[in-house]
Amino acid sequence: MSTNSIKLLAGNSHPGLAELISQRLGVPLSKVGVYQYSNKETSVTIGESIRDEDVYIIQTGYGEHEINDFLMELLILIHACKTASVRRITAVIPNFPYARQDKKDKSRAPITAKLIANLLETAGCDHVITMDLHASQIQGFFHIPVDNLYGEPSVLNYIRTKTDFNNAILVSPDAGGAKRVASLADKLDMNFALIHKERQKANEVSRMLLVGDVAGKSCLLIDDMADTCGTLVKACDTLMDHGAKEVIAIVTHGIFSGSAREKLINSRLSRIVCTNTVPVDLDLDIVDQVDISPTIAEAIRRLHNGESVSYLFTHAPV
């Protein structure tokens, strides 16, 4: 059992999630001021002593225009804690920024996810907690421990309680998500189908091919994130054109950037379900949210007490 106390700090990216984690742990959020000067430089002040404490900084990767500002907030907060002589700094990043830039997929392309890992370590981070990394190998970019939590247990609970899964089929919108969907199918004893998509450029899918029979069935379309929603909407159209009864999209990270709102309004999706790893303010009837703050809070508690977090890979806290 650790003798130093938990200190929770939060940037401006997701105050709602930070408050839920605080309530779950019974630990108040520490006083933090994050401001921008007129020239847009970020300034941070920590309003209480954190010397020799176990500090957790909650800041998610989010925002069409603010994502880089939020990243700078996180780095400056980490550095401020480091210079304040804390015992350990854990960055809690539910949605890891730049996670899709994880490999050199064309000439002269940067591996930006590796750069983010370097920046976090250089700032003084000792540990990272995140959820459903777009590419799990990003953990290997770090020289510090990374706990990549899974949204799967919470998704399983939602499917079991909020859908007629006995008369449904799971669908992966691309080959990369097949492993994720196969894991859910095994646990739910369900069949699954696969959509192969061909991209000509980023965020734009040109053609989709369905592998599997979805005629007359409810389709649960599973993915790790919904950004512009082009993939999900085209996948939904493909499924409906092949005779699907309805399509429910279930994702971990509901980014919903660009024209996502308009696409969802005009789509044939019956429902889109996401967690609250990032703020969602679409105000659409078809959008439903799953709260993952209990999982993150329990991971913080276990890490602070020196307990294993592997239980959370297969179970959602009650």
Curated annotation (Swiss-Prot):
It comes from Saccharomyces cerevisiae (strain ATCC 204508 / S288c). Its EC number is 2.7.6.1. It is found in: Cytoplasm. Keywords: ATP-binding, Cytoplasm, Kinase, Magnesium, Metal-binding, Nucleotide biosynthesis, Nucleotide-binding, Transferase. GO terms for biological process: 5-phosphoribose 1-diphosphate biosynthetic process; purine nucleotide biosynthetic process; ribonucleoside monophosphate biosynthetic process. 5-phosphoribose 1-diphosphate synthase involved in nucleotide, histidine, and tryptophan biosynthesis. Active in heteromultimeric complexes with other 5-phosphoribose 1-diphosphate synthases (PRS2, PRS3, PRS4 and PRS5). GO terms for molecular function: ATP binding; kinase activity; magnesium ion binding; ribose phosphate diphosphokinase activity. Present with 8120 molecules/cell in log phase SD medium. It holds the Pfam family Pribosyl_synth. This is Ribose-phosphate pyrophosphokinase 2. InterPro entries: PRib_PP_synth_CS, Pribosyltran_N, PRibTrfase_dom, PRTase-like, Rib-P_diPkinase. PANTHER family: RIBOSE-PHOSPHATE DIPHOSPHOKINASE FAMILY MEMBER (PTHR10210), RIBOSE-PHOSPHATE PYROPHOSPHOKINASE 2 (PTHR10210:SF32). Its main location: cytoplasm. GO terms for cellular component: cytoplasm; ribose phosphate diphosphokinase complex. Mg(2+) binds at residues 132, 134, 143, 147. The lineage of its organism: Eukaryota, Fungi, Dikarya, Ascomycota, Saccharomycotina. SMART domains: Pribosyltran_N. Gene3D superfamilies: 3.40.50.2020. It comes from the Eukaryota.
